[in-house]
From Swiss-Prot:
Belongs to the MON1/SAND family. It comes from Aspergillus oryzae (strain ATCC 42149 / RIB 40) (Yellow koji mold). This is Vacuolar fusion protein mon1. The lineage of its organism: Eukaryota, Fungi, Dikarya, Ascomycota, Pezizomycotina. Residues 26-37, 57-79 have a biased composition (Low complexity). In complex with CCZ1, is required for multiple vacuole delivery pathways including the cytoplasm to vacuole transport (Cvt), autophagy, pexophagy and endocytosis. The MON1-CCZ1 complex acts at the fusion of vesicles with the vacuole, through its regulation of the SNARE complex during the coordinated priming and docking stages of fusion, and particularly at the stage of tethering/docking. Pfam families: Fuz_longin_1, Fuz_longin_2, Fuz_longin_3. InterPro entries: FUZ/MON1/HPS1_longin_1 (IPR043972), FUZ/MON1/HPS1_longin_2 (IPR043971), FUZ/MON1/HPS1_longin_3 (IPR043970), Mon1 (IPR004353).
Length: 628
């Protein structure tokens, strides 16, 4: 079985040829291209060509998978169109360059399950006896029954190249160089004030930043900037507003442009313009996703009706005062994008790896202590999701959870007052028109600390209990639920289990595949809208090395999701790394090795990672969650 999956990957990578140029990219090409080239050679004066060798079985397999994918789209199109939802879909915030067609991930035909998902290679047994009955194929089933996916409303709208499912050759003439020399030690330092230093020196500090985010109104008023202040950037704001207005006067909309090595991306949202200026290796689509997330952060404070009303009454409204206090959240969110955010790149969420039985125990404790006013309940440990309790017919939006995580772990005021907070918040994916009310409490996992965390506990040292209600008068009711829930966790040992899982950390690639050439990988389960990854240690421990790694992933992601790229396997070599992207209807795998890594060894390690994830699926991902 291992040899079968390995052979498929090797065929997709172009055989056993290990030769590579200084910077190269390769993808699985279409058999029709080979046939056409043979016909061209047959017309040469050198005589008839030798007979064609038999077509490899791998190409037949890929062609059959493509036809199955087309049959799937026809059979599910009417069901997807008739399904009502009020949630914001990933088409709005995570569409690739390939277009707006929806990818139906709810069910796959039987002919695709064994071939596209490679589920026939998964062990029938789980990781141990307790999980043996829980390990299931990573192919989303046709009918979820009573246990739906945590993000079920958003799976069907994920777009990508799999609509075409072709094996056409990727025309990518030159792979961009890595951020080899980038040093981010000063990227997040303040630029200074004009009063303290000379204006020219402050301006040079501002220009030296590799990435800027600007938010301005349609009237040209600066609202927020990651670096500097309104006075420093007012001239540049005026230039940007003039350029945008010029295109709008021509009945056109400016989305992006490039000047030298700098990319400018503009997103218009009603009365607001959000602008990203980047010299980091990121695609237009990736920068748009980041601007969309910043816009959702603004809506979480103001709500869409309030924002619209402010500018309808007074178009020149200064939004700084209504957003006062949210600047820190915008800045921390922007900095996470600059450092590199796998969650934003993949539009997915990471969960804490624990045994299925342990996760079910935590779910049962949430359901047992639940109050009638509870809408959503979340348990987050070490910055990763552990458990979710939700209504049966309501799903969570990944963008909303990203906002919650950013607010809970980055706002300094949240841990004040003994680790308890009561926060009004708008979750745009749930309802952009109104507020929900969020009770947040931290539990310190340090052995010398009590149950309640203080403001010295880091994100990795505490468990956050997040309880969300539609009623602003339910603080004490949710506080009582939290106390009962923590008491239950202590009784059944769940707090200790979470602490051990956090201390253990993410696995290294060599822990999963001994002797592997891989240094790091990202794996996204498309059906669960969740991802897992290996440890950054020891190769990517610094901020600059981690940024370089994310630049490699950005290039891989942009290449394989390009609108002209209908490939499943994409292999690239640059001066600092060898990387591989492998995309199927079931998963996305991105992995990075050293610059001299053998192509066959890379394919072998990738297949081993896929098998490991399938065996550990219900430890790595939350499937269904607790519903009521």
């Amino acid at each position: 079985m291992d040899s079968e999956i390995k052979n498929q990957l090797q065929d997709s990578l172009g055989g056993n040829d290990d030769s590579k140029d200084d910077i190269t990219c390769s993808s699985k090409s279409s058999p029709t291209m080979a046939a056409s080239s043979v016909r061209e050679r047959s017309t040469s004066p050198e005589g008839p060509p030798p007979p064609l060798p038999p077509r490899p079985n791998t190409l037949n397999l890929l062609d059959e998978g493509a036809s199955s994918s087309r049959t799937l789209r026809q059979s599910t199109q009417s069901a997807l169109q008739s399904r009502a939802t009020t949630a914001v879909s990933l088409t709005d915030i995570a569409s690739h360059d390939g277009g707006k067609e929806s990818y139906p991930a709810r069910g796959l035909p039987g002919t695709l399950r064994a071939k596209a998902s490679l589920s026939h290679l998964a062990s029938p047994r789980g990781s141990d006896t307790a999980d043996s009955a829980s390990v299931k194929s990573s192919v989303p089933q046709t009918d979820f029954g009573e246990v739906e996916n945590v993000f079920s409303d958003f799976v069907a709208t994920e777009s990508g190249p799999m609509q075409h499912d072709s094996t056409g050759l990727l025309q990518f003439p030159e792979f961009q160089a890595d951020d080899v020399d980038d040093d981010f030690t000063e990227e997040f330092e303040p630029v200074g004030d004009v009063g303290d230093e000379g204006e020219n020196e402050v301006l040079e500090n501002w220009k030296s930043k590799r990435k800027h985010y600007l938010i301005l109104s349609a009237a040209g008023k600066p609202i927020w900037t990651r670096h500097g202040d309104g006075g420093l950037i007012s001239t540049y704001i005026g230039v940007i507003q003039t350029i945008i207005s010029f295109y709008e006067d021509s009945q056109d909309r400016l989305n992006s442009f490039t000047a030298g090595d700098t990319k400018f991306v503009i997103v218009a949202k009603g009365p607001l313009y959000l602008v990203a200026i980047s010299r980091i290796l990121e695609s237009e689509t990736q920068l748009k996703l980041q601007l969309e997330a910043l816009y959702m952060q603004i809506l979480s404070t103001l709500t869409l009706p309030s924002l619209t009303h402010l500018f309808s009454v007074r178009p020149s409204t200064d939004l700084k005062r209504p957003l006062q206090g949210s600047e820190t959240l915008l800045s921390t969110l922007a900095d996470s994008f600059t450092k590199g955010s796998p969650s934003t790149l993949l539009s997915a969420l990471e969960c804490l790896k624990i045994r299925k039985a342990h996760r079910q125990t935590i779910n049962n404790a949430l359901l047992k202590t639940r109050t009638n006013s509870l809408l959503y309940g979340l348990v987050v440990a070490g910055g990763r999701l552990v458990s979710v309790v939700r209504p049966r017919k309501h799903s969570l939006h990944p963008g909303d959870l990203q906002l919650i995580f950013n607010m809970v772990f980055e706002a300094e005021a949240v841990k004040a007052g003994g680790g308890e907070s009561w926060i009004p918040v708008c979750l745009p994916g749930f309802n952009s028109s109104g507020y929900l009310y969020m009770y947040v409490s931290f539990v310190d996992l340090r052995e010398d600390a009590g149950n309640v965390a203080d403001d010295t506990a880091t994100k990795e040292e505490s468990v956050a209990v997040i309880l969300i209600s539609t009623d602003k008068e339910r603080f004490f009711e949710l506080q009582e639920m939290r106390n009962s829930f923590i008491e239950q966790l202590e009784k059944d040992g769940s707090l200790k289990i979470m602490k051990e899982a956090i201390d253990k950390g993410r696995p290294k690639t060599t822990d999963i595949v001994p002797g592997t050439v891989l240094h790091h990988f990202l794996y996204k389960s498309r059906g669960n809208v969740q991802f897992t990854m290996s440890s950054y240690e020891p190769d990517f421990s610094s901020v600059s090395r981690r940024r370089r790694l994310m630049s490699t992933y950005n290039n891989l992601h942009a290449s394989i999701h390009s609108k002209h790229a209908h490939v499943r396997v994409h292999h690239c070599v640059s001066q600092s790394s060898t990387s591989l992207a492998w995309v199927t209807p079931v998963f996305q795998l991105y992995c990075v090795a050293g610059p001299n890594a053998n192509r066959n060894a890379l394919a072998h390690s990738a297949s081993k990672i896929v098998q490991w994830v399938q065996q550990e699926e219900e430890r790595l991902f939350i499937i269904g969650g607790a519903v009521f």
